[in-house]
């Protein structure tokens, strides 16, 4: 299931050179993307017990999650992260909540692995499983946002998450936990033998790093203006989502598998005015790996990428490699992809069992 229209300023193609019916289709897709809207209520995380500091002892995730839950149960509004440094564990978004980081707000995620349990339902490299809690996660929520001019820092480095990829140049040493020690192969075997998803319980010892932001079966989503740094794994991972806007976001993460934004089996997506400076693909379109992708058979479709800058990464706009559910209607316009650090501008990854 393939239909792609890629139009990049890099290639010197003028808007007028492309058949107008193609642009009209992208305009119709954009009209289908629902916009978030929130009541005027504001919930400051300090009012729920969040304290500034980065000494490794004071964690703010309980206060932040309480503020989010209270806001959602009251009908929605804005959960405010004021200026200052806040050390936190995993955050769970709820419907009708805008998590807003004011300029000067610095949300730093701890690398203490025990904080990211119990596991949650997700996908890891296109395979369904229960894995470590993403740093920011939502399941089945609607009308949610992460906005503001603050910084969200996963604090991943060779000293913690990145070494789990199993590569010595990312800090791995013999005897350390790593995905190559059997965890990744175990997950792939679960999928190929059609093991029930609730039996696919991955643990820290399996070495499968969590995403920075993972939104699962959510709709009407906005991620705007924030800076995202140092992700353990993929940075923005919408999964089975619909009506997503990613606007004005700066991504800076040079670890292994630090994809910038990976819409997976998602529909009606706009990514615009963003800067991607990554250790892997800047944007990668996905729809599941092998058996799991074919089982759900949900393509990624109606995706618009425009006015973005790809400064570093394996590929600017990439399809795959986990693309077994197919993809269609991908529009790329006026993106700057001329950095000497960018390996490829457009890349389609495929093989005979995965699609693409």
Where are these regions (language model features)?
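Bacterial N-terminal signal peptides that target proteins for export
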Residues: 1-2
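Extracellular "leader-to-stem" segments immediately downstream of a signal peptide or signal-anchor
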Residues: 6-8, 12-217, 222-224, 233, ...
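Short glycine/acidic-rich loop motifs that flank beta-strands on beta-rich extracellular proteins
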Residues: 76, 89-90, 110-112, 132, ...
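Right-handed parallel beta-helix
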Residues: 103-104, 142-150, 219-229, 242-253, ...
